[in-house]
């Protein structure tokens, strides 16, 4: 599934989105940008015009991209006859001059720490000695938050995505230093008291903007949620526990893909029953590398790497072998489960310290859902609806392909028999048989991937955004050192087509070897504090990328995917061999790109004067709406068949071919949603009151595994009561207690789609309505008011149980 990486903002100085992220001289001049705008909602008849073709080639043709980079450098006078890669003009990562080396990152963090401490000192002095100090206090608090987030966000990105271990080590060190200081600020009583007094002084608030007051209230709220009323000893304990949770979370995410064992032993007599002789031969070839076994003469060790385990799960008719392989693939290491148990215990401890019933109550207090009871009700109703709507029917289709099933048995089987009769290790095996049977009467399907190159999809998205938002993508050449892989990372400016002004920048790496699809906010939009003279243009030019007037910093987002390059040769690019065939995507991967671009456009359009509530810095159970909504566009033939072209012939994708592939794709659609609801329920249970009670009675021996198995038994449908898969669920940390957000936002997105875009997904009128009611506000407006405006339903503005009922009704 496609999940964006977002770090939850439970404290006022906590980092921005992570895990859901240009120097002006390298931006094309306004006269170079494709002009013209239209109020028409007509969809483009072709994405083959000059700007789209250029954008497509930037991503699909490595030689074209290299030529573009070289040409841009030569045109701007950066080099003479040397290729751009040998340019003497250097930059740092994301055009931050400090980030040219790992050591530079550490120095940047130390300098930023000094700057932050100096700003705090001046704020605390000015607020008492000068009336202007009270008026500028919230702006400076926001600037303080931005100074720290500017370091922590880029460090988090480097820690997760950078290919160099030296950079990763420096980022880890940086993150720990800055995060500890942020936690100290979150419990700084003097900072809080000044803010509280300012917000309660009507003579001051009368002179503040509405956004300044909103940000002030937001920061005050989070101070209070960080235990500001505790005694000094308790506050220090709070900071220490919060820091420990951060470290545990980092360890949890780093070990998420590790298995308890990379070998699975099965009886030799079962192995001999395997029908695939080539597979048997391949497995036997690994035996010399297998770890020693007490029963080596009676067993065979199957490696849990490469295609072997997945081939067994889809083709092996011996259930006992599938069972052992499936459990082994889903078992986390004992250390990973211990890490999970520890951060769950510490979260429950924090919630108790702050006077909340549970960590879930703490997290949901200011979210759309308001409390865990509403979430559990939403999920329970959703699961009931899904079971009635199609889950049972989908599993029944699988059940009939069990090796021991007869038509009579299928007809006589009860719903419980059917659900219990299909185990999790049966899913892929039976689905493979179902798909083969479904394909028997179909002609050989043409490969749809050839219509879906990366460049085609990016260019198509630009055309779509131009149609509905009047913004487009413009490629930008990068300086040496500006990206983590100059040969691979593409940079595009998001440009308002009516004004030709930049809204922000995207750094796109579709071929990362180490990161699942993710959206990282590197810099948030923010108006510079030039009027109160707490920062200067000259200094900010070295750190961020500014707008044309040099009065605001532009948002910078990095989108990372782990797509495989086509025709990767063994010689490699350093021998002068480049891929000529573009990277071709599956429909699921297209959904992923659309999803992540939804987050990106939220950051680009949701520009605010203060960074704390810009772009994706809104309620966590609202932040997925723009990304989930984009999946409705990627699934609509009126969109995909307009933008998808064969990478060689330029032939458009036919609706018939798309429909055939989509039919294959959604065979277990209801089951997939149900499984996601189980994960959301697990997230609630592991952050519930029961956990608080359990650790109060026996802190040391808390174990999440029995809780996981108990919930699986209760909710059924591919129930897992054997493995420790919950240790492989990254969002238990990054989305603790709010994983339901995806399902809630999917329900909201369905309402938005049907209310605005279902009639015409290329509609400028619908796009403007959506942009002005939801996207442009960032986090400065109550989400329920945004929805009430977008859907023209005043009942939603209350955000009560009735509003939740309206959203949940007939959804999904």
UniProtKB/Swiss-Prot annotation:
Q: How is the cofactor bound?
A: Binds 1 zinc ion.
GO annotations under biological process? intracellular iron ion homeostasis; peptide metabolic process; protein processing involved in protein targeting to mitochondrion; protein stabilization
Q: Where in the cell is it found?
A: Mitochondrion matrix
Q: Which reaction does it catalyse?
A: Release of an N-terminal octapeptide as second stage of processing of some proteins imported into the mitochondrion
Composition bias, Low complexity: 37-46
The UniProt entry's GO CC annotations, sorted and at most eight, read: mitochondrial matrix
Q: Where is the transit peptide?
A: 1-29
UniProt-recorded Gene Ontology molecular function terms: metal ion binding; metalloendopeptidase activity
Q: Which residues form the active site?
A: 596
Annotated region (Disordered), positions in chain: 19-49
Similarity remark? Belongs to the peptidase M3 family.
PANTHER family, per the entry: MITOCHONDRIAL INTERMEDIATE PEPTIDASE, PROTEASE M3 THIMET OLIGOPEPTIDASE-RELATED
- Kindly provide the name given to this protein in its UniProt entry: Mitochondrial intermediate peptidase
Q: Which organism is it from?
A: Scheffersomyces stipitis (strain ATCC 58785 / CBS 6054 / NBRC 10063 / NRRL Y-11545)
């Amino acid at each position: 599934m496609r999940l964006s990486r977002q770090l939850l903002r439970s404290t006022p100085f906590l980092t921005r989105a992570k895990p859901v992220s240009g120097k002006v001289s390298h931006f094309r001049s306004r006269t170079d940008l494709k002009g013209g705008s239209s109020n028409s909602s007509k969809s483009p008849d072709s994405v083959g015009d000059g700007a789209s073709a250029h954008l497509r080639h930037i991503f699909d043709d490595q030689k074209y991209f290299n030529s573009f980079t070289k040409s841009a450098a030569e045109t701007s006078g950066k080099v003479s006859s040397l290729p751009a890669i040998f340019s003497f003009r250097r930059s740092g990562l994301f055009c931050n001059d400090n980030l040219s080396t790992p050591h530079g990152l550490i120095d940047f963090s130390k300098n930023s720490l000094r700057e932050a401490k100096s700003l705090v000192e001046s704020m605390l002095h000015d607020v008492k000695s000068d009336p202007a100090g009270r008026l500028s206090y919230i702006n400076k608090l926001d600037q303080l938050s931005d100074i720290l987030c500017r370091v922590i966000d880029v460090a988090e990105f480097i820690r997760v995505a950078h290919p160099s271990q030296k950079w990763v080590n420096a980022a880890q060190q940086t993150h720990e230093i800055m995060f500890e200081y942020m936690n100290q600020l979150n419990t700084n009583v003097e900072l809080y008291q000044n803010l509280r007094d300012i917000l309660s002084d009507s003579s001051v608030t009368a002179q503040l903007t509405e956004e300044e007051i909103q940000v002030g209230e937001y920061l005050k709220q989070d101070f209070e949620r960080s235990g500001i009323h505790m005694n000094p000893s308790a506050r220090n304990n709070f900071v220490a526990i919060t820091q420990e949770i951060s470290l545990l979370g980092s360890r949890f995410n780093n070990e998420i893909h590790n298995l308890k064992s990379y070998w699975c032993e099965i009886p030799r007599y079962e192995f001999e029953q395997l029908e695939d002789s080539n597979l048997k031969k391949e497995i036997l070839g690994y035996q010399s590398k297998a770890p020693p076994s007490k029963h080596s003469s009676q067993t065979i060790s199957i490696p849990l790497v490469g295609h072997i385990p997945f081939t067994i799960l889809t083709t092996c008719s011996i259930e006992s072998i599938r069972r052992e392989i499936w459990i082994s693939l889903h078992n986390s290491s004992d250390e990973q489960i211990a890490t999970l148990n520890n951060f769950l215990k510490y979260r429950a401890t924090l919630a108790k310290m702050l006077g909340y019933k549970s960590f879930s109550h703490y997290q949901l207090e200011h979210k759309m859902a308001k409390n865990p009871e509403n979430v559990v009700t939403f999920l329970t109703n959703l699961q009931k609806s899904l079971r009635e709507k199609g889950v049972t029917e989908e599993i029944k289709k699988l059940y009939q392909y069990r090796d021991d099933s007869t038509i009579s048995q299928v007809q006589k089987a009860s719903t419980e028999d059917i659900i219990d009769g299909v185990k999790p290790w049966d899913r892929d095996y039976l689905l493979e048989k179902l798909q083969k049977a479904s394909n028997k009467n179909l002609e050989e399907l043409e490969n749809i991937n050839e219509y879906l190159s990366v460049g085609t999809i990016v260019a198509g998205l630009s055309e779509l955004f131009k149609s509905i938002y009047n913004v487009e993508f413009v490629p930008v050449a990068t300086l040496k050192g500006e990206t983590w892989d100059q040969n691979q990372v593409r940079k595009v400016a998001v440009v308002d087509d009516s004004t030709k002004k930049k809204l922000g920048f995207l750094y796109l790496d579709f071929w990362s070897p180490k990161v699942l699809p993710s959206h990282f906010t590197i810099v948030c939009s923010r108006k510079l504090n030039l009027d109160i003279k707490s920062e200067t243009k000259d200094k900010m030019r070295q750190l961020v990328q500014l707008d044309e007037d040099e009065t605001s910093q532009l948002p910078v987002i990095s989108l990372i995917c782990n797509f495989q390059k086509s025709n990767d040769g063994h010689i490699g690019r350093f021998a002068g061999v480049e891929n000529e065939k573009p990277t071709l995507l599956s429909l699921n991967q297209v959904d992923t790109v659309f999803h992540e671009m939804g987050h990106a456009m939220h950051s680009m359009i949701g520009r605010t004067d203060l960074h704390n509530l810009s772009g994706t810095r809104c309620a966590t159970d609202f932040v997925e709406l723009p990304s989930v909504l984009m999946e409705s566009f990627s699934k609509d033939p009126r969109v995909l068949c307009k933008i998808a072209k064969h990478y060689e012939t330029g032939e458009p994708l036919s609706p018939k071919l798309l429909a055939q592939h989509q039919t294959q794709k959604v065979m277990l659609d209801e089951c997939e949603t149900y499984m996601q609801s189980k994960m959301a329920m697990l997230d609630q249970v592991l952050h519930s009151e029961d956990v608080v009670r359990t650790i109060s009675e026996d802190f040391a021996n808390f174990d999440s595994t029995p809780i996981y198995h108990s919930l699986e038994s209760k909710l059924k449908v591919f129930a897992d009561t054997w493995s420790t898969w919950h240790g492989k669920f990254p969002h238990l940390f990054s989305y603790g207690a709010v994983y339901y957000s995806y399902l809630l936002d999917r329900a909201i997105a369905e309402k938005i789609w049907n209310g605005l875009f279902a009639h015409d997904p290329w509609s400028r009128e619908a796009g403007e309505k959506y942009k002005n009611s939801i996207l442009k506000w960032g986090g400065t407006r109550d989400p329920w008011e945004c929805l009430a405006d977008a859907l023209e339903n005043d009942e939603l503005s209350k955000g009560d149980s009735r509003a939740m009922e309206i959203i949940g009704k007939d959804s999904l």
